[in-house]
């Protein structure tokens, strides 16, 4: 089997159209968010979703230790938000959001939002 070129593989996979979400949480009164496209429904009964983070992600430990997260399903008009949370240190000051009772941020004007445990 041929060795796969990482850049060609990435370019090929980028042609697959998928939804974009921002997964967010609150850890010790600090808000964290990450752009995620590896989001999927897992089950309707019980209602379960899943998302994946790279093992090398600086936010992996934070999300693993979180008891709850918000999942914000972005529209095609929210590329600026997607790009913001794709950065290592996103700027929450640029984002229009509310805070849920559990402390997690929920981004306003998304297609949909989920509050997940």
Feature-to-residue mapping (PLM):
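Active-site-proximal mixed secondary-structure blocks
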Residues: 1-117
